[in-house]
């Protein structure tokens, strides 16, 4: 089965040697996204809610480039700098995934790239 590299200017360019996403068959594997504004290339300043929104918007843009949407997401992994931000992150998360409710794990990590508060990766399935 062939794999296809997914890239869009509507999401941040990767900050390392990886793709924004890879599509294999009906699956789309979105790389970890941090709250970088794709227009400025800068980290979104602000609290966990603002950073969560930017991360999900980045994932959404990548999925759209692959012909999918947030409704097609089946699994999300959330990395938080501080698990005390869990409830606030969930407030924003539920605005985007309230209906589809993909499987998910959320973990606290000691540090994230560029010292952001959150990173998310997603797997989608699109027929």
UniProtKB/Swiss-Prot annotation:
CDD domains noted in UniProt: YjgF_YER057c_UK114_family
Gene3D superfamilies: RutC-like
Pfam name, any one: Ribonuc_L-PSP
InterPro entries, sorted: RidA (IPR006056), RidA_CS (IPR019897), RutC-like_sf (IPR035959), YjgF/YER057c/UK114 (IPR006175)
One Gene Ontology term of the molecular function aspect: deaminase activity
Gene Ontology CC annotations of this record: cytosol
PANTHER family reported in the protein's UniProt record: 2-IMINOBUTANOATE/2-IMINOPROPANOATE DEAMINASE RIDA, 2-IMINOBUTANOATE_2-IMINOPROPANOATE DEAMINASE
Family the UniProt entry places it in: Belongs to the RutC family.
Name under which the protein is recorded: RutC family protein PYRAB12510
Source taxonomy: Archaea, Methanobacteriati, Methanobacteriota, Thermococci, Thermococcales
């Amino acid at each position: 089965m062939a794999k296809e590299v997914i890239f869009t200017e509507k999401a941040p360019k990767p900050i390392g040697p990886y793709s924004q996403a890879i599509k294999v068959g009906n699956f789309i594997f979105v790389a970890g996204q941090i709250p970088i504004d794709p227009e400025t290339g800068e980290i979104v300043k602000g609290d966990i809610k603002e950073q969560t929104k930017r991360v999900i918007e980045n994932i959404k843009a990548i999925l759209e480039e692959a012909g999918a949407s947030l409704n097609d997401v089946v699994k999300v992994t959330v990395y938080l700098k501080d698990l005390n931000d869990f409830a606030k992150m969930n407030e924003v998360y539920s605005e985007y995934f309230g209906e589809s409710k993909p499987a998910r794990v959320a973990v606290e990590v000691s540090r994230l790239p560029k010292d952001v508060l959150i990173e998310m990766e997603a797997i989608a399935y699109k027929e």
